[in-house]
Structures are given as C-alpha cells and as structure tokens.
C-alpha cells in the first residue's frame, strides 16, 4: 500500500489507488524431455526436445481483479561430434530455450520506491526465445606436444525483454517492460602452443573476444 504525505508532514489514511496493490501470486510449472543419440564410427549425433508449461495466477486483493498467464516453453537441442585421428575433435552444438517474463515484469504495477524513476510492469509481455549456436575444435599431438583449439559461440534472442523509457518535463523517468528483437551476443576464442621437453618449457598463445548488442527504447 502507498500513502501520500500531507502538508503537515502526516500521511493520508486513504491509499493512493495509482501506486497501491495487494497481490497474491501462484506459479505452477511442469516439465518433460526426450533425446535420441546415434553413434557411427567417428561420428556422434544427438537430438532432443524438452517442453514445459508455466502458469501464473495473479490476484490483486486491493482491486479484486485476477490475471492469469500461461507460457509453453520449448527446449530443442542438437549436437554433432566428429573425432578425427589422434586427439582431434570437432563439435557443433545448437540449443534453443524460451524464457518467460518474471512476476515483476508482467505485474501491472506502478512502483514508486524511487520517485524519480518509476517502473511499470507489462501484463502483455511475450516470452523470449534464445537460439544458442557453438562450434569448437580441439587438437593435441601427444608425440610432439603440439596443441591447438578454437571456438565460437553465438546467442540470438527473439522477443527479448527490455525497457521503454520516457522522461517528463519535470525530470521523472518512466520505464515500462517491452519485447524487442535484435539482441545478440557472440564470443570467440582460440590458441595454440607446444611443449619443449629439453627445456621443460611450454610455449603458446591465446586470444578471445566478444561482442554484445542489447536494444531498448528511450
């Protein structure tokens, strides 16, 4: 409950209907998954799928209103591994996952814990979906002590959850949760080296990098 201050420093005994709420939340989740694996000579293939359903029930005892949301979540995954001669391996993986909004993000509340920065929930938020791709290569020559590796990972998000901000002439910022496209993250890594037995020394180098893009509205 939120109460407004009076001119004499006391607080009004009547709740501020814009900022007040009394919520009861119930969350129910059920999950299931399956996978298929196939091995043939130097190849290993795996395909799987998981699914879950999450149900939200939000009852505002202050306004005597009830909101319900149901999210169906899918978790596809696949991998391909090819083992070459010696200790060389090539691995390609994909996984997908939905992510439902949190209670704070979908509840239609106006939060005034910080009077200059007001956060508003969005009951119409969609769940986001992440596509995760990765490619890895590893090689090690036991006799010569030479090793090398490289990899890249890329995550792309559909209907990502972000914020839309607006600022009033008085300097108050209002932030509302919204869905956006165009969010992604990518990183890469690699290295190589060898062991010099007669010097009891290992020489090598490594490199890595990353790029991240996250959209919001102002």
Regions found by a protein language model. Name each.
Residues 1-218:
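Exposed, low-structure sequence patches enriched in small/polar residues
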């Amino acid at each position: 409950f939120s109460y407004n201050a009076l001119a004499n420093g006391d607080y009004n005994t009547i709740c501020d209907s814009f900022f007040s709420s009394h919520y009861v939340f119930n969350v129910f989740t059920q999950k299931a998954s399956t996978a298929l694996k196939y091995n043939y000579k130097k190849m290993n293939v795996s395909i799987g799928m998981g699914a879950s359903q999450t149900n939200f029930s939000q009852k505002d005892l202050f306004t005597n209103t009830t909101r319900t949301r149901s999210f169906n979540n899918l978790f596809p995954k696949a991998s391909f591994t090819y083992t070459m001669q010696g200790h060389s391996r090539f691995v390609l993986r994909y996984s997908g996952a939905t992510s439902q909004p949190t209670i704070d993000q979908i509840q239609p509340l106006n939060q005034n814990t910080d009077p200059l920065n007001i956060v508003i929930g969005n009951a119409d938020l969609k769940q986001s979906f992440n596509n995760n791709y990765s490619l890895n290569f590893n090689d090690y020559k036991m006799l010569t002590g030479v090793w090398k590796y490289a990899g890249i990972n890329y995550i792309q998000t559909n209907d990502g959850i972000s914020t839309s901000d607006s600022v009033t002439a008085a300097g108050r910022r209002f932030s509302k949760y919204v869905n956006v496209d165009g969010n992604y993250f990518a990183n890469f890594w690699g290295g190589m080296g060898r062991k010099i037995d007669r010097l009891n020394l290992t020489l090598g180098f490594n490199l890595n990098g990353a790029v991240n893009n996250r959209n919001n509205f102002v």
